[in-house]
Swiss-Prot record:
Motif (Histidine box-2): 141-145
This protein's name: Delta(12) acyl-lipid conjugase (11E,13E-forming)
Cellular location(s): Membrane
Species for this entry: Impatiens balsamina (Balsam)
Chain segments annotated as transmembrane: 56-76, 84-104, 179-199, 225-245, 249-269
One GO cellular component term noted in the UniProt record for this chain: membrane
Pfam families named among the record's database cross-references: DUF3474, FA_desaturase
Tissue note: Expressed in developing seeds, but not in leaves.
Composition bias, Basic and acidic residues: 12-26
Chain ranges for the short sequence motif Histidine box-1 as given in the UniProt record: 105-109
Length: 383
């Protein structure tokens, strides 16, 4: 028993040393955004309305197929088989929904087509059907891209300093505590972020994606926030009418649970895209846009990469060129990887294992060496 403590401490030191050696460089890179753009074939920046609509129709057909199977055949199964069939349906449909969300997200970046009005129309319909305020998130998400990895200004997952940690942060190092926090984040993280900016950028007053007067938005955007709210009211009304016709339990089984899984996937994927022990964060004295965009990690979700339209394994190039359509991102990533060198971070750790590991390791940020590299911070968990 007496050797457990020192052994664990030795492992921790070795882990931290290895992480330090594998870190993404924090110095200004030897290349510019223009250098990267010149290396990418011009066709990678071309948006095709036909191709984009193909992906929308493709996903809607798959969504409809699984809905039809679930609604018409699962209730006919023996009860024991229903207990297996419903969770399978929920998992599949939640993943398909995430793919549709990515297409709506692409509309918000004007990466869907050459026509802004088409992008906004399609994105508004897709996201409203998923109870997401399209324009509201479009504007806040754009600010995330403008301030990625900035401790003070990034819109999502702003890291805390050690002195600012909440009282419950210490339980992230405890398996039970970490499990409960992950469960809570996956279940409530996305709706609470939209509702009251939970785990979002700190503002001087209440912030919500549903409030047109929220400090998240400027005066030009407030009318579109109202339009987003109107879209959600209509979506909720449709769901209410469906519940009256089919029953509340039916609606929960067919739409509700996949919706919850969609919400969990949003949190899981976005957290892992920018949270890693080897990625730097910057305060305002050191931050610049390019280094912030490079503070991004591509991850491997296996066959789900394709279902998610490669938002998972091509996220860095998306941050560099937000109007690039997803079906060109893989090619562009491979082209710029040799130029990026050590500035490109890829982690093939299975995503659930990565979530568990990084949730425990990335608790707060601090500067490594006092007096050196001021403005550059790294994740730590030494509580």
């Amino acid at each position: 028993m007496g050797e457990v403590g020192p052994t664990n401490r030795t492992k921790t030191k070795l882990d931290k040393q290895q992480e330090s050696e594998n870190r993404v460089p924090h110095e200004p890179p030897p290349f510019t955004l223009s250098d990267l753009k010149k290396a990418i074939p011009p066709h990678c920046f071309e948006r095709s309305l036909v191709k984009s609509f193909y992906h929308v129709i493709h996903d809607i057909i798959i969504l409809s197929f699984f809905y039809y199977v679930a609604a018409n055949y699962i209730p006919m199964l023996p009860q024991n088989l229903r207990y297996v069939a419903w969770p399978i349906y929920w998992a599949i449909q939640g993943c398909v929904q995430l793919g549709i969300l990515v297409l709506g997200h692409e509309c918000g970046h004007h990466a869907f087509s050459d026509y802004q009005w088409v992008d906004d129309m399609v994105g508004f319909v897709l996201h409203s059907s998923q109870l997401i305020p399209y324009f509201s998130w479009k504007h806040s998400h754009r600010r995330h891209h403008s301030n990625t990895a900035s401790i003070e200004r990034d819109e999502v997952y702003p890291p805390a300093y050690k002195n600012d940690l909440p009282w419950f942060a210490k339980y992230l190092r405890n398996p039970v505590g970490r499990f409960l926090m992950i469960f809570g984040a996956l279940l409530f993280g996305w709706p609470s972020y939209l509702l009251f900016n939970a785990n979002g950028r700190l503002y001087d007053r209440f912030a919500s994606h549903y409030d047109p007067q929220s400090p998240i938005f400027n005066n030009r955007e407030r009318l579109q926030v109202i339009a987003s709210d109107v879209g959600l009211v209509f979506a909720y009304f449709v769901l209410y009418k469906i519940a009256l016709a089919k029953g509340f339990v039916w609606l929960i089984c067919v739409y509700g649970v996949p919706y919850v899984i969609l919400n969990g996937l949003i949190v899981l994927i976005t957290f892992l895209q920018h949270t890693h022990p080897n990625l730097p964060r910057y305060d305002l004295s050191e931050w610049d846009w390019l280094r912030g965009a490079l503070s991004t990690v591509d991850r491997d979700y296996g066959m789900l990469n394709k279902v998610f339209h490669n938002v998972t394994d091509t996220h860095l190039v998306h941050h560099l060129f937000t109007t690039m359509p997803h079906y060109r991102a893989k090619e562009a990533t491979e082209v710029i990887k040799p130029i990026l060198g050590d500035y490109y971070k890829f982690d093939d750790t299975p995503f659930l294992k990565a979530l568990w590991k990084d949730m425990g390791k990335c608790i707060y940020v601090e500067s490594d060496v006092p007096g050196k590299n001021k403005g550059v911070y790294w994740y730590n968990n030494d509580i």
